[in-house]
């Protein structure tokens, strides 16, 4: 029975180039899609750029472009990656397309009519200089849990804490450096806490193998409430205030859908765009409209995603679809991240970053990487580690040494001695070997279906070992010199080519370009899994051309070579002229405690600080940090000050020292002012040496 599948990968955010994590996911999904096509199924494989949100709006403004043009320019570079790594999307679209506007608003109305949308007034940070509400990631400040500086408004990269932006200490706008103010605004919430949603999601996440067991275990945590009734599913804020680049919420002027509401709907929008362009009709003779197709219970819907976006795809997305009257996914396939050298996080500056375009520009074969990634992938949520030495070994030993060599060891004899024609009488041993290879077809199709690509490739290479054992046992190079052994030589070489064809069928989902070369060499129609049970017989093949080069280890050195670092001025300015230690020792730096902080009337920049420097009295110091700190947030903090600076008479009084703070030389380009704080344990009066 022919299956009909709708397959997607996570939508990349349209503010930058693809990274290796994107390519890994596309390769994983593409292998599965190509396998399904080779099994004779109808697959609609679509992608799109995630085009909305404040980050894109702000990046476009900095680039002097409209958001639409900014996104279009990013999208124009996608094809180089997708073609380069043989990713076979049927359609690539954008969440800013008219289809997504229509679908997002339609789905929202259905949720609203179902009583699952609620309007609430909330307080959120507003940048008075930019005149806009700030997204969580554009608010920075001190972590409310551990006190780490310069953390984002929703989570701490130091201690891992998650919090709301209003909990951040000493917040500032990452856009302007201004201190944000709290303003009230009506926001629209999807009531995920509604008992109907909770009941449905409890059922959906546990039925029919929709999720991997590791994912189910994680989802259970999100359902769980503590002894005080806290936790469990929370309502989802799906709105953002103008100015915002996104889709307007119906009947709510100045309100836009949060990007995570319309982004997954972009899966449907890309499919609709594909249908509207006539793609399925041209490819499969599909006569139905998008609406008819997507409503068909027999249509299977699959999403490949990274583990970092599991929450959205296993809770919000199925609930959004179900309660808007739409079909939910059959499966959400979650994968891990890509690391390098036994789990090290990738970093371009350290020379541990794998740049996909650099890989291609070095002339490295895309199918080396496809094979290597596939060999590491399984159906679990595990990270994939790229080890350069392992990469060279697997490609050279497996692909070239075991698989390609089979054809090269036989094709020359067939061409020279038999005009390229295969024998139809393959002998008992040869037939037994080929039957062994054919018998693995169902095992391999089961492994591909289950996304156990690593196991599948180990099976194939095990079969390649058997073929090479057959070659070594029969020694065609000796048969070619032996008088009267032509018939045996013909049979042995024909068995090798037939075995090579079977192995190529089994590898074709992973190595489509190489398979196309093999099809040309064998002079056969495109290979499918159904052909594994058929033999070529007395068939004439073409002349053998070299199919794949070995990996030169020097290419890996070049791939991971750190980019040349441009000479830059640290902090935006040259290091000051060199001084002697005696000069530095003249400056007396001391720890001080801020006893009191208050604004200075008539000054936009100054705060009046009352400091305890451990002298038995307090000092009065004026500091130009008003734009970065609220007075009430400074009281009780420990700072570093210049204690032996001569008192200076100012318009507002006498300043008895200087508080140390850091900033970039160009504060407009890189805003932010950061008072220096000592580690816990320092006390007033301690000298900084």
UniProtKB/Swiss-Prot annotation:
Location of the tRNA-binding domain: 583-689
Organism in which the protein naturally occurs: Leptothrix cholodnii (strain ATCC 51168 / LMG 8142 / SP-6)
Gene Ontology molecular function: any one: methionine-tRNA ligase activity
Pfam families in UniProt: Anticodon_3, tRNA-synt_1g, tRNA_bind
Motif range ('KMSKS' region): 345-349
E.C. code: 6.1.1.10
Family: Belongs to the class-I aminoacyl-tRNA synthetase family. MetG type 1 subfamily.
One Gene Ontology term, aspect cellular component: cytosol
Record: residues binding ATP: 348
Enzyme class, broadest EC rank: ligase
Identification of the protein by name: Methionine--tRNA ligase
